[in-house]
């Protein structure tokens, strides 16, 4: 009876958390919808008097708005990619691992299993990275997200504003979303500013439009400042081929810690996110190379790394491991043992 009550309570709490997790997204959507109304109707159709200026403003605005909304949608609804089945422990191995009471034997079991996989990163103490929640050996750059309750390939962070985990499958879309958000705010601020001055001087009569135009400039500038900082930080991460987690805690390889272990050079680092074909760089479609399980590494020479030597990868078995301190709990990453 008590167990059933606890299960019902736990299920109710999970349901409430899932519902509440959409609140930040709803806030963003409402702000964007209001900005659309304020710009299109109150500014362009009511305040702007020149027909040519109206047309130019509306065309440019909608071009930016489409890409802004498209990338936001892709960031939200592109599911995080999880490690494939070859990284999961079989039922027999799982039971053997769970029933083994000696830590040193458990560690050796993971070492033996990892020998079949292209795993080059380790925990802080040099052990194979293993997720005891998902029961798998983690691919390189893969981490467990406590919010999504899953291991995510090339996890960067969990973002409440898109209610999704940002990783290999959607990092390109997230970066594009930041870029188009900055452009969206900048465009609104620059085109609204002259009318803000006119309202401030009392040269325009409409009281209702005055409120929307003034507040629109304030909101656009506020979001622009915060977004340009975040976008600049992620541009720096891309230029170094790092994730947010790797920027906070240096990856540990079999040879030891190496903060530039995945740094291939500026151009190749960009291609690791956007792909080789530049015509897809500005469009939110999947073009990141690889399958998210293994990545070219600077710390390995071409004879050791099949991704740099253009050889066949290890039968789709690609994985990563690493430890992170408690200070990163706000990034929704479970500690690894």
UniProtKB/Swiss-Prot annotation:
The active site is at 159 (s-palmitoyl cysteine intermediate). In brain, expressed in both excitatory and inhibitory neurons but not expressed by glial cells. Residues 293-337 are annotated as: Disordered. It comes from the Eukaryota. Keywords: Acyltransferase, Golgi apparatus, Lipoprotein, Membrane, Metal-binding, Palmitate, Synapse, Transferase, Transmembrane, Transmembrane helix, Zinc. The chain crosses the membrane at residues 21-41, 57-77, 173-193, 211-234. InterPro entries: Palmitoyltrfase_DHHC (IPR001594), PFA4/ZDH16/20/ERF2-like (IPR039859). GO terms for molecular function: palmitoyltransferase activity; protein-cysteine S-myristoyltransferase activity; protein-cysteine S-palmitoyltransferase activity; protein-cysteine S-stearoyltransferase activity; zinc ion binding. It is found in: Golgi apparatus membrane; Postsynaptic density. It is a multi-pass membrane protein. Residues 312-323 have a biased composition (Acidic residues). Residues 129-179 form the DHHC domain. Palmitoyltransferase that catalyzes the addition of palmitate onto various protein substrates. Has no stringent fatty acid selectivity and in addition to palmitate can also transfer onto target proteins myristate from tetradecanoyl-CoA and stearate from octadecanoyl-CoA. Palmitoylates IGF2R and SORT1, promoting their partitioning to an endosomal membrane subdomain where they can interact with the retromer cargo-selective complex. This is Palmitoyltransferase ZDHHC15. It comes from Rattus norvegicus.
């Amino acid at each position: 009876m008590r167990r059933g009550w606890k299960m019902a309570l736990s299920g109710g709490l999970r349901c409430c958390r899932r519902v509440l997790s959409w609140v930040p997204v709803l806030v963003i959507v409402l702000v964007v919808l209001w900005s659309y109304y304020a710009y299109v109707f109150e500014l362009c159709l009511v305040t702007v008097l020149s027909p040519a200026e109206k047309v130019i403003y509306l065309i440019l605005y909608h071009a930016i708005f489409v890409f802004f909304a498209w990338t936001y949608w892709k960031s939200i609804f592109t599911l995080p990619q999880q490690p494939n089945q070859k990284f999961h422990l079989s039922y027999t191995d799982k039971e053997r691992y769970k029933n083994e009471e000696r830590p040193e034997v458990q560690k050796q079991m993971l070492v033996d299993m990892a020998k079949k996989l292209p795993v080059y990163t380790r925990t802080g103490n040099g052990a194979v990275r293993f997720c005891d929640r998902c029961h798998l050996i983690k691919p390189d750059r893969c981490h467990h997200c406590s919010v999504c309750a899953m291991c995510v390939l090339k996890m960067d962070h969990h973002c409440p504003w898109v209610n999704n985990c940002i990783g290999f499958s959607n990092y390109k879309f997230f970066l594009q979303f930041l870029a188009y958000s900055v452009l969206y705010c900048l465009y609104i601020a620059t085109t609204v500013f002259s009318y803000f001055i006119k309202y401030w001087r009392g040269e325009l009569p409409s009281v209702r439009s005055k409120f929307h135009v003034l507040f629109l400039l304030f909101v656009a500038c506020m979001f622009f400042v915060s977004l340009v900082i975040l976008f600049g930080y992620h541009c720096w991460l891309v230029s170094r081929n790092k994730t947010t987690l790797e920027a906070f805690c240096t990856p540990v390889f079999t040879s030891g810690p190496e903060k530039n272990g995945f740094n291939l050079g500026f151009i190749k680092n960009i291609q690791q996110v956007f792909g080789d074909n530049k015509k897809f760089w500005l469009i939110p479609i999947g073009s990141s190379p690889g399958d998210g399980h293994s990545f070219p590494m600077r710390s390995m020479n071409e004879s050791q790394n099949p991704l740099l030597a253009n050889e066949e990868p290890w039968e789709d078995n690609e994985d990563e491991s690493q430890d992170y301190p408690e200070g990163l709990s706000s990034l929704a990453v479970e500690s690894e043992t």
